[in-house]
Amino acid sequence: MKLLLPVAGRSSRFPGMRPKWLLTLPNGQLMIEKSLSGINLTNITEIVVIMLEEHKKFVSPENIVESLKKISNGLTVKIHLLSNLTSSQPATVASYLFENDYDFPFFIKDSDNYFEYMPTSDNSVAYIQLSDLKLVDAGSKSYIKINKFDEIELIAEKSIISDKFCCGGYGFNSSKLFLETYNSLGGDKNNDLYVSHIIQENLLNGINYLSYQAKNYEDYGTAEGYYAHVKKVKSIFCDFDGVLVVNSSKFAQPPWQYEPNNENLKFISNYLEDSPYSKLIITTSRPTSEKINIIKFLLKYDICCHEVITDLPHAGRILINDFSKSNPYPSSQSINLVRDSNNLSEYF
């Protein structure tokens, strides 16, 4: 089956920035790369990105093909270019389907979120339980009601009819049927058409759809959701002496001691566990010869540091970082902590 990634929207919720599917997330991936990375591609034979011709000024189609091939184990990746904006996501999908004479199953994946899921070639909808999430724009989603056999009885757009919302993954076993239903609902003339409307029309016509629960959902579809995700991730430049251990020096007996500041160590360990994309960089005046000892010491407290920068001057430090609409002001912050105090958590 084919995996379709429709990315031809206006990105109107992200003014003054690149198209949202090309925004860089904290882990260094483009949003479209991150979106694809959670999908089990066992049943996928081809990936199709449906993008606007005008977006070529931001990225070359060849680069998109190569980047998606790398994270899909070499699957065939094709680009379908649109010369004009479409009226809806179904219209974007239909523009590609119209150019294929044969009938085939396909799976639509939104490009502005992440979830873990394995598409199958049947009619299906991926969903998430509302109770599994801390932050979600509940009113912007579509929802499903299901029976005890996990069959969908009703799907509704922007109406909370259950605790199961559609997370942006839709399977169709027939491209021809999708187009027939699309045309019956007004096709290109319908400016308020959603994929959920296609599915609901098919349900009314007696066609079955199954529901499958997805996992580990992350939403970047709105500016608020995107910024909330970005803000959860930090590059933490942390002094060693006086913060994570009681301050020591080469003149101590013995030199460079490792008396733990347990409260601060516990806080940093918990922070990194809760924010797995964050990175800890240790900054210290200790010599390079102590680097291995610092790493081993931190591992005792379940802290894995990204880097240890040694031999710094025993003097003030200044952090300089740029800011932009995709990484807004203030993009850097500083904490001045009383030496050997154990209340680092209060400043975060």
Walk through the language-model features, giving the residues of each.
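N-terminal nucleotide-binding beta1-loop-alpha1 segment
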Residues: M1-M17, K231, S235-D241
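Short beta-strand-to-loop acidic/aromatic patch adjacent to the donor-nucleotide binding site
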Residues: D103-Y114
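HAD-like aspartate-dependent phosphatase fold
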Residues: V233-F348
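Conserved N-terminal catalytic core of the sugar/cofactor nucleotidyltransferase
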Residues: K2-L5, R13, T24, Q29-P105
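Short, surface-exposed amphipathic charged segments that create phosphate/polyanion-binding patches used
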Residues: A91-E99, S140-K145, E224-H229, R317-P328
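Conserved alpha/beta core of the MobA/IspD/sugar-nucleotide pyrophosphorylase nucleotidyltransferase superfamily
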Residues: F165-V233
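Short, charged/polar "capping" segments at the starts of alpha-helices
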Residues: E54-E62, L135-V136, T288-I294
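Conserved core of the sugar-phosphate nucleotidyltransferase
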Residues: Y114-K189
